[in-house]
Amino acid sequence: MSLLTEEIPMRPDDQLAAGARNLLLNCAGLKARDRLLIVHEDPSLGWYDKAAPLALGTEAEAMGISTAFVEVGGPEDDESSLTADRASADCDCVVYMARIGDLNRFEVGADNKIRIMCYARDADALASAYGRTHHDAMLELKDAVNDVLLGADRIEVSCPLGTDFSCDITDQVREFGDVAVQRFPVGVPQAILAEGLNGRVALARYLTPTGNRSYKPASLAFDEIVFANVKMGRIKGYEGDTATVADVECHYKTVSDIFGIDPECVHSWHAGIHAGAAFNKPAADDPDRWSNNVFTNPRFLHIHTCGAYAPGEICWMVLDPTVSVEGKNLWQDGRLCLEEFAPLRQAAQKWPILSDLMANPSDEIGLSG
């Protein structure tokens, strides 16, 4: 078991405690005498700090929740998942402050435990608006966005770099509840299936993993914009600098060969809805870490590709999208619009914190300019 068990400190500061309670009470629904396991990643790997799991455990113990810790490695460490599974046998809830919580998150769980993947990677994130915005408010915002998108016949998407595609919505089934592992904070609506997606997507800066499975190289960096041409959810080719196109095609072949999957499939897409999401390090330091932190910010729409399943293996990150439904913008230049559609207006009226959040978004996204 983790040494953190012996290191639970004094109560965290008020904002950090509020973020912890938001997760424990509003997301997990825990109560006194419940049993909690916090699976936390080795801080030396650079994705999670030590202070956030400590703060969560401190607040849980103060609430009368029996708390245990286990430290794990990264997603490429096969033993980590086994270690976490063994440690969770007698608990009611598992909170993953570790990337292994994201692996195969779309699979259906069979043990009825509450499982939560925490994207607040450090104490600063947990204490910020990202961690403190009421979980129920974000759930209602997600539902409102789903109402608009899933009720549409066609959605139009563009971006300043030249992305221009439409997506026809054909009887997509509404998902109630989250994937097998709940996500905290709530950051994206239901993914829109790309079977009816036609147009082109500007690929810029990086191709990154979706977090579903671990592979190497995890990302591809490039300087020139490449356009992916898509027809009915299939990649039909790339346009742009010859060498860069070759690099993109090679990366797709590498990843698809590793898993024996369809490299041409564009499975689904969604855009961020949590304006508190921040990434204060340069994306170039670790493009994988960047994209898997910042994807919940409304300034990004991301597209799941390479694999005919959710969420695929390679992600396209589209900066500052405009997403239009019936001639009205749901996102405009990377800002989620609360006023254009009745479901969002109603959510904002019920939860004024949503208007405050959108009026004061985080623009720390790891990119300059």
Predicted regions and their residues:
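Active-site bordering "gate/hinge" segments
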Residues: M1-F227, K231, V325-G369
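A broad, low-specificity signal marking well-ordered, structured residues that form hydrophobic/aromatic
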Residues: I155, G199-V201, H267-W269, L301-I303, ...
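A generic structural signal for well-ordered coil/turn residues at beta-strand boundaries
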Residues: L197, E224, C265, N297-R299, ...
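Short conserved micro-motifs at the rims of enzyme active sites and ligand-binding pockets
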Residues: R213-S214, G240, N280-A283, E313-W316, ...
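Dual-mode signal for accessory low-complexity, basic/Gly-rich regions
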Residues: A221, G237-Y238, A243-H304, Q349-I365
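Internal helix-turn-beta structural module
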Residues: D288-D356
